[in-house]
A protein has these predicted regions:
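Structural motif
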Residues: 81-83, 112, 259-261, 292
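Buried hydrophobic positions in well-ordered alpha/beta secondary-structure cores of metabolic enzymes
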Residues: 15, 82, 116, 235, ...
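Long, hydrophobic/aromatic-enriched structural stretches that serve as scaffold segments
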Residues: 75-98
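C-terminal active-site/capping subdomain that shapes the small-molecule cofactor and substrate pocket
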Residues: 269-360
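Short, acidic/small-residue loops that bind anionic groups at enzyme active sites
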Residues: 98-124, 131-139, 319-322
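ATP/NTP phosphate-donor binding region
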Residues: 1-78
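Oxyanion-binding "anion nests"
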Residues: 226-265, 269
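Conserved anion/nucleotide-ligand pocket segment
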Residues: 133-233
Length: 360
């Protein structure tokens, strides 16, 4: 695995828009404020031509223009790290115009984004053996003040941090809108982790069935392996395409084992279950050590009696590995910045989780 150099003091932050740009509110104002904040921290900025573009369908510009920008700015020596302007809908089409051979031959560079940016963070790992950060997009850094998760992501980029923890509360409903573009996360809900582990011979009950451990004092759990994953909506879309080298990646790193992280955006509970089934049957979960599952955007919803827990656990039970759910990953902020492709140790103590990156 190739790990990029950290963002140096007085370095240059590059911004690209392979998915949505920051063309409309509240993202436009938030992105402008993010630039002010990074400039105040001493950094120079290198904005790609699509950062404010609104010419595409589901992305900032045409797939050709987006792919060209992403390749050029990743391989450029004019910036030290890249942050994606935002998520979106059709970044998969951008991938057809990204030169992965050129990226693989270039000096590795930290790329950060989430949601639709799974198309890049996942493929950087599986195609290029290059680590990236599944974390906040550029406009989020415009909030006043920064949430702790934004500081974590920034310090991870700078090399000032090699571990992340869960946060006390999460945002069920955002207050940010066109008239209030710089509001911080509206964290109102206490984080309550759900911990499912295979039953052993000494715990009673049917051996091998998943049981839920209380996220309370006295409960401890540790996992170690290589992180891989992203937004399920995007992951299952890549499955079976020419970009799908996931099974080969898992085989290449089988001695480490894979810790999958997953979260869902548009998918309802049935959609999540179908996607998990497809990934499982495609062999993606070979050499798996465990699963880190973020709160789905459709949190708390049921679909014909199926909830978010059974949508995942029923199908993954036979893999006989721990499944940690309702984590700070994904679309219901805040989110722990995760190093895609990174080797990590996950430690759970009660309702607390810590991820230590062991190779940074």
């Amino acid at each position: 695995m190739r790990y990029p150099k950290y963002l140096p003091e007085q370095g240059t932050i590059g911004f690209v828009a392979p998915s949505f740009g920051c063309a409309i509110e509240p993202y436009h104002t938030a992105f402008l404020n993010a630039q002010k904040k990074f400039t105040a921290l001493g950094y120079s900025l290198d904005l790609g031509p699509n950062c404010y573009a609104d010419k595409g369908i589901g992305i900032s510009n045409t797939p050709e223009a987006c792919g060209r920008e992403l390749t050029e700015y990743y391989c450029s020596n004019k910036n030290d790290v890249l942050i994606s302007c935002g998520g979106g809908e059709l970044m998969c089409e951008t991938m057809d115009y990204v030169d992965f051979e050129q990226i693989k031959a270039a000096e590795p560079k930290w790329y950060m984004g989430f949601s639709d940016n799974t198309n890049m963070t996942f493929l950087l790992a599986t195609l290029c053996d290059t680590a990236s950060i599944y974390g906040p997009c550029a406009a989020a850094f415009g909030m006043e003040p920064w949430h702790e998760s934004l500081t974590d992501a920034y310090e991870l980029l700078c090399g000032k941090k090699d571990s992340v923890c869960g946060y006390e509360q999460w945002e069920k409903e955002s207050l940010k809108d066109e008239e209030h573009p710089l509001l911080p996360y509206n964290v109102t809900e206490p984080r309550k982790m759900r911990i499912f582990v295979p039953q052993n011979e000494n715990s009673g009950g049917e051996h091998g069935r998943l049981i839920e451990l209380p996220a309370a004092q006295g409960t401890t759990l540790e996992l170690e392996g290589r992180l891989l994953g992203g937004c399920i909506d995007c992951l299952v879309n890549l499955l079976g395409t020419k970009y799908d080298k996931t099974v080969e990646f898992a085989e290449r790193y089988k001695e480490d084992g894979i810790i999958w992280y997953m979260e869902a955006c548009d998918l309802n509970m049935m959609g999540i279950r179908r996607a998990v089934w497809q990934m499982k049957r495609a062999g993606w979960f070979s050499h798996v050590k465990g699963f880190l599952v973020g709160r789905p955007a459709q949190f708390g919803q049921e679909w014909i009696g199926l909830d978010q827990y059974h949508a995942v656990c029923d199908l993954l039970e036979e893999l006989q590995v721990p499944i940690l759910m309702d984590l700070d990953i994904g679309h219901l902020a805040p989110m722990m910045p995760l190093v895609s492709g990174g080797y990590a140790k996950v430690a759970v103590t009660g309702n607390d989780i810590r991820i230590n990156y062991l190779e940074l």
